[in-house]
Amino acid sequence: MSSSRSNNRATCSRSSSARSKHSARVVAQTPMDAQLHAEFEGSQRHFDYSSSVGAANRSGATTSNVSAYLQNMQRGRFVQPFGCLLAVHPETFALLAYSENAAEMLDLTPHAVPTIDQREALAVGTDVRTLFRSHSFVALQKAATFGDVNLLNPILVHARTSGKPFYAIMHRIDVGLVIDLEPVNPVDLPVTATGAIKSYKLAARAIARLQSLPSGNLSLLCDVLVREVSELTGYDRVMAYKFHEDEHGEVIAECKRSDLEPYLGLHYPATDIPQASRFLFMKNKVRMICDCSATPVKIIQDDSLTQPISICGSTLRAPHGCHAQYMASMGSVASLVMSVTINEDEDDDGDTGSDQQPKGRKLWGLMVCHHTSPRFVPFPLRYACEFLLQVFGIQINKEVELAAQAKERHILRTQTLLCDMLLRDAPVGIFTQSPNVMDLVKCDGAALYYQNQLWVLGSTPSEAEIKNIVAWLQEYHDGSTGLSTDSLVEAGYPGAAALGDVVCGMAAIKISSKDFIFWFRSHTAKEIKWGGAKHEPIDADDNGRKMHPRSSFKAFLEVVKWRSVPWEDVEMDAIHSLQLILRGSLQDEDANKNNNAKSIVTAPSDDMKKIQGLLELRTVTNEMVRLIETATAPILAVDITGSINGWNNKAAELTGLPVMEAIGKPLVDLVIDDSVEVVKQILNSALQGIEEQNLQIKLKTFNHQENNGPVILMVNACCSRDLSEKVVGVCFVAQDMTGQNIIMDKYTRIQGDYVAIVKNPSELIPPIFMINDLGSCLEWNEAMQKITGIKREDAVDKLLIGEVFTHHEYGCRVKDHGTLTKLSILMNTVISGQDPEKLLFGFFNTDGKYIESLMTATKRTDAEGKITGALCFLHVASPELQHALQVQKMSEQAAMNSFKELTYIRQELRNPLNGMQFTRNLLEPSDLTEEQRKLLASNVLCQEQLKKILHDTDLESIEQCYTEMSTVDFNLEEALNTVLMQAMPQSKEKQISIDRDWPAEVSCMHLCGDNLRLQQVLADFLACMLQFTQPAEGPIVLQVIPRMENIGSGMQIAHLEFRLVHPAPGVPEALIQEMFRHSPGASREGLGLYISQKLVKTMSGTVQYLRESESSSFIVLVEFPVAQLSTKRCKASTSKF
């Protein structure tokens, strides 16, 4: 499917790279940003913002303009005057660059009139260490050797001459180290990187508030966040600003001073926040402007440097002229902007291990704070806000995932209903019935152009206009299967202007060479609701000429005047799926018209494919059961009544209760009293489809374990479901916490004898580490060394977060920033004296193996009760359990894949079957000969047999012999002839004749029972015999021996013996064994025989396989009640077929 977008980016399915699409948007927007920047620099006071945005969208900048623009954005030559900047060589600390105000701020400016030979106090090449007191330059030198210097920020330093304190905030650039120096307010208690706990305490209440909010309410989450940030920082206005799919922005939450105009609901064009600025927000999460009207300070640098130094990561970076003017126009003097990043969308490539790969980040939005007077926020408070935003990012990740899942579920439900309609009336039914195609994706109208007729829903173009669109698609997009665009104008459709704003966006799919389905969307502005006052021409922003939120809004409306809301990837996937179903349905319909019998011949192979899929699923399931039974972790399961139906060997070993004694007992009877409510909660949640995690239950002990006290388990509950997704029970995957609780009790009793625990060589001791109140490792026990691959000497004295567990290529790497944020919350919560929840924590060890664990942390105190750090335990599943869980995931995935495949096959086969039935209905009233009527009757029976097989989704009921059997009146000979017809293609191909041999009464015998199942089993046995018979060996004989029995005066039972005889040696013995004893490794043929044998048994019959010297035979013994005996003359049948 081709696509057309206003910014030339492709609309593709989720299997395409989301990262590539974002790159395309960046490439498209950057020249527009550069064009606007060039126009602003060239026009200054006469710059007309609204019209320039529209012009930039229509024309691009030259390559040289783009390069100059990016250079200016990333390598500006000015800083804000509230601090000073130093750039140094990373090894020698020789000065490479400095801001002009550095000498004055560091009190290096000479007070006397300088002489000619007096040396400058600060110059390129100066050893920066000489500018600070000894303890300060030692701290700077140590930080320079650290892998990630950002983790050590801020470093408290003191000027050598005056002793004035500064926060030194360091980051690396291509030529060395940049040091931002911010003066410390004497009334504030100075902190360093080790004072991160203080920063955490500042935001602790806000973090707890965010984490306590219910999921599924993004608006509430954003409202709470802006209020918390407002209380923390004191800014006059705080806004949550979200980037949409097409890169434009929207204010979705706001907390402001009552006298300020609201900006809630205001939309901004993508160019309002240039892509270069967004890149800077990804690099430097916090951007502070203390006074936009302050004169910026120039940076002086070494002439030998080939280009200006990069100040992307510097908080001191001065605002550009256009941004300063924008702030001034809206009455804002100071600002604080913090980025909100989330995990990038993962490509749906089917890689089962993708969830264990490190994830990239993308910019979701910004937290924007404005103040009407100059305002400075010290680093500790900025760090607290940044940490709060990281927590918010984790919450947003959850909300984005939940929203995507909800949307997919809605689309899948709608697709299912649409497929059902298609079976009755394709493709018109999806327009004439409810739900319809407009329920599949959000749109304002839809149209079906099919066989030169038109069906429409909602707001659509006229019939003539739709025909013009069809002609345009056939002429200019004939090579594609469809087109999607958010702007027909920019897609090049010549009649777009005539459509007005009613139809701007369109998704079209081709369901045949001349037939189309359309979805239409109106212009974006219709969706926009702004909470602010409406714009009046007499307002102070000069009718949109100045840069102001109002002019941004006006520019945005101008940009989207001919554009609709973009088509999301998940929506295009749904549309594309419907297209495939429709195309397949229409092709099958055409094929059935040309060849009515073709589908019947291929049906058995589809059936075997279904059975093969279930066989593979059964094999995986059996392997999973074996692993669970032998796992070294306790695993148990209950049915929906709460009775035990699974109890593995480890559970039996820990409790002393054997498997056979546990099965059938209520779980609540096996737990101690204080765990009864927990078990009931888990079961109630499971019945609602909610899976509880990390809950503690205590099991009673029995027999030889009775004196050891209860077994303490940390359990995760997994809902067990059948193929229809109905919850049928709960499986508990547990960790034995008894040993850890013993250790924790001992730890509590000894009150600080930590070393005795950590260095204990007992295998009961789990992986343990300790940190001090600064976040550095103090202890790292042997179990931690084994699981992480990091030796004790390499962990001790290292920062736990940043050096040991990291997002970089050294230490133990975690999947994403969110994991480190959660770990930081856990450590800070403990050290601040609170009781934290256990943390599900995953990381890659030094061998690259992904480890999943449950982390428990508790505070460490000294003799006076002062908190000195944290003691942490890791609970890791055994390799056997990890493998079992992996197999379980594979099993669930295989089950879902098989279910989807089977559903698709069953769905697709119904269409040709319906076509065949329709053809049959046309033929029945015709004047047919007796022979033709018999052929038609056999054809009907084949179709009905195939339909019966397609409804077999519960093989377990067949195996247990309680599948439902039909009861109909049928003619036995017609059923037998149908069996022979099914074998004819294979018989003719192998040139093996099939003889039939049955007495005269069979032809006129009408019985009562399930004729279709009888046909199925006899046809399966016959096909198996044909497979293992060679042409030269002789014919196959289908023999029927009936015996009638009178039951009372009015009822007869027909005892039937079917003998299917073929020449020796016959069917291999291994296959016959598979027929009677199902095994996980059974072949397709063996599984077919096994199912047929079970069906015969369900009919109260038996199957035998007899080997003789000359021949071998399947012998099927069944009985049916006689419905009636025909009075017409019966003839014996002994002919060849």
Swiss-Prot record:
Pfam families documented for this protein: GAF (PF01590), HATPase_c (PF02518), HisKA (PF00512), PAS (PF00989), PAS_2 (PF08446), PHY (PF00360)
Domain PAS positions: 620-690, 750-824
Residue ranges of every copy of the Histidine kinase domain listed in the record: 904-1124
Region (Disordered), start-end ranges: 1-27
UniProt keyword annotations, A-Z: Chromophore, Photoreceptor protein, Receptor, Repeat, Sensory transduction, Transcription, Transcription regulation
GO process terms (BP): detection of visible light; red, far-red light phototransduction; regulation of DNA-templated transcription
Residues that coordinate or bind phytochromobilin: 322
GAF domain location: 217-400
Gene3D superfamilies: 3.30.450.270, 3.30.450.40, Histidine kinase-like ATPase, C-terminal domain (3.30.565.10), PAS domain (3.30.450.20)
Species of origin: Oryza sativa subsp. japonica (Rice)
Keyword RNA-binding belongs to the record: no
InterPro entries tied to this protein: GAF, GAF-like_dom_sf, HATPase_C_sf, His_kinase_dom, HisK_dim/P_dom, PAS, PAS-like_dom_sf, PAS_2
Entry GO CC: nucleus
Gene that specifies this protein: PHYC
Molecular function as annotated in GO: phosphorelay sensor kinase activity; photoreceptor activity; protein homodimerization activity
Post-translational modification: Contains one covalently linked phytochromobilin chromophore.
Function: Regulatory photoreceptor which exists in two forms that are reversibly interconvertible by light: the Pr form that absorbs maximally in the red region of the spectrum and the Pfr form that absorbs maximally in the far-red region. Photoconversion of Pr to Pfr induces an array of morphogenic responses, whereas reconversion of Pfr to Pr cancels the induction of those responses. Pfr controls the expression of a number of nuclear genes including those encoding the small subunit of ribulose-bisphosphate carboxylase, chlorophyll A/B binding protein, protochlorophyllide reductase, rRNA, etc.
Name of this chain's protein: Phytochrome C
Family according to the record: Belongs to the phytochrome family.
Stored SMART domains: GAF (SM00065), HATPase_c (SM00387), HisKA (SM00388), PAS (SM00091)
Known partners and oligomeric status: Homodimer.
Compositionally biased spans, kind Low complexity: 1-18
